[in-house]
Amino acid sequence: MAERRGSSGANGVLNSLNPQRFTSQIPSIGGNTNKKGVPGTNAALTDMINKSLARNGRSSLSRPVPEVRKSLRRSLRSSQRPSIVPGGGPSAYGALQSTRDPRPLRDKNYQAVLQQEIFDYLQSRKFDIETGHAISLKSLKQPTQKDFICIFRWLYRRLDPGYSFKRSLETEVYSILKTIQYPFLDTINKSQISAVGGSNWHKFLGMLHWLMNTSQRLDSCLHKLDESKTMQLTQDITILNQPVTTLDEQDEKHEQYELMVERLFIEYISKCYKSFINMEDDFSPFKEELEIGFDRFVHIIETDINNLGRQEEMLQQDCEMFAARCEGLKLARSKHQALKGDLVKFQNYINAMKNKAEDWPRKLNQMVEEINEKKGLIKDIHAEIDKLRQALSQEDIQEIDQMNQQRDTFSKMLDTVSSKLDNLTGSVKSQKLNLESSSKVFLDTLEKFNASINGFVLARNNLQHPINPAELLIPVKANITLTDSTAITPSTILEGCTDILSSIKPNLLKVNKEIDERISALQTENNQLEKELRGLRDTITSKGHMLESMENELSNIKSEYDEYQQVSHSKLLSQRIEIEKLERKIQNDRHKTQQRVAQAEQEIEDAAFKLKELTLKIQQERVVLHRKLIKVIEYVVSFKMDVQGSIEALHDFSVEQLESL
């Protein structure tokens, strides 16, 4: 993916970088960053980033795309680490800079201790495997320049993993020690760095030991930071799993929700930034971790909502149960009132029927006696008529007339008696009909009473209040046949019960008293249940408000997530468009590069051919020069011989002249 980006993308990143975005997230380790004359960590890092951006911004147009990209990331990496210590001020390990090192570095025993600690640290961190350079105690006692360079670079990359060594060794080491504020930098100069294995090795050994301690402290701080994050996450999950009972706890849970979301975004941005600094463009694992974190967050919210829903369902079930019990109580109370009214009506009806039943036998007996008297009277009249007929047949007509007159009088009397008898018979029949209807109504009333008692007993048995129905039922004889000669009495209708007041009424009063006692107990229990119901309604209301607030919060979070997803999708589309443009540009550049490579290869071939020609020409000229040189040497030798001969001749001549003188 790095090959697809062009210079315009790199320049856009350079121009859009805001140093404060990075420095605001880096913790300050130095304890005295606010002292006078000592700028803070964030200020130092901001200055370094600004300088790096300015330097890269000026040279980005003249560099190739990969060089601009690497320069950008290296500048960011080199500007990231100085936030460990305050810039321009004292070191984090010493409040004052001193030119004198208090450590006994010249002591051989102390040097042995430092060498052993450095060797153990390098071995424990697998120095030889990572660098491919073997290390031993001898390398720390009598180091070569290569040993020192490997150890120094490895130790510094423990502090700044993205740093790239580009300049000369003396300048690079000295500038790095100055940047990280080595407290004893004045004891080292650049000329000593080029030959560290001599008499100045103890200074560099102390410097390497200081770097080792700094790396160990940094590892310890990062480990504690990871532990604190883990503990904080555990505490957050513990708090979120606790049930909410008050509004303050609900607000605290909402704050924990917000902190979890912020922590997810901060971790995602931090990991992406670290990956960008390390020249890695694959952010998909971090995005997957962010999605997993959001899934966990949504799962926690859904779990809370499900818990609240279950609590609401339980409270709703309790409320429905109490409401059903109240409805049953109201129904029992209404049935009790109805049965009580029916009992009063039945009692009044029984009393009225009892009074009537006491009068009807006497009236019926009187009617029977009158009927018997009338029948006897009729028999006497018929006997007299027969006698009169016999006497009439024996006496004369006068007597017959008298008899006719008497007959007329008797017939009138008979008509009068027959009319009275008819009236009496009609009244007897009407009374008989009334009595039959009354007896039927009485029997129907008894059946209704017994049915009501059976229903009442069944209802009481369902309520676990058993009652003996034999104590309340009025037994009625089966197949009752009433004739004119049968007197209607309680014994003719009822079976085994001659007095309802003495047998049934006490039992009904006893049951009524028990019902009144249970009603009073149920009223007391109902009052308590109503109090509990009011409390449960208040709790349901508060839980409902909490649920509404959480639903609103969830909807807000979902809307924000949808907005963020839309923005991300739009950014992704724009980036894809830009990537396509860059790919087309890269294809064009690749085509041009291939052409230039072919041209360069042709030029290389031409240059190689010219080189061969020049080599042959040089060889030929060398042969010619050798010949000329031989001639010159021969000429010089001959000239020397001639000069020596002339000198010897001159010397001999001079000697001869001197001798002649």
UniProtKB/Swiss-Prot annotation:
Gene3D superfamilies cross-referenced by the UniProt entry: 1.10.287.1490, 6.10.250.1950, Ncd80 complex, Ncd80 subunit
Major subcellular location class: nucleus
Region Disordered, annotated ranges: 1-38, 54-101
Locations listed in the record: Nucleus; Chromosome, Centromere, Kinetochore
One Pfam match: DUF5595
UniProt key word Cell cycle: yes
Key word ATP-binding present: no
Coiled-coil regions listed: 368-398, 507-623
Keywords assigned: Cell cycle, Cell division, Centromere, Chromosome, Coiled coil, Kinetochore, Mitosis, Nucleus
GO biological process assignments: attachment of mitotic spindle microtubules to kinetochore; cell division; mitotic sister chromatid biorientation; protein localization to kinetochore
GO cellular component, one term: nucleus
Domain of life: Eukaryota
Compositionally biased tracts (Polar residues): 8-35
GO MF term set: identical protein binding; microtubule binding
Assembly and oligomerization: Component of the NDC80 complex, which consists of NDC80, NUF2, SPC24 and SPC25.
Similarity annotation: Belongs to the NDC80/HEC1 family.
PANTHER family per the UniProt record, alphabetical: KINETOCHORE PROTEIN NDC80, KINETOCHORE PROTEIN NDC80 HOMOLOG
Cited function: Acts as a component of the essential kinetochore-associated NDC80 complex, which is required for chromosome segregation and spindle checkpoint activity.
Name of this chain's protein: Probable kinetochore protein NDC80
Species of provenance: Eremothecium gossypii (strain ATCC 10895 / CBS 109.51 / FGSC 9923 / NRRL Y-1056)
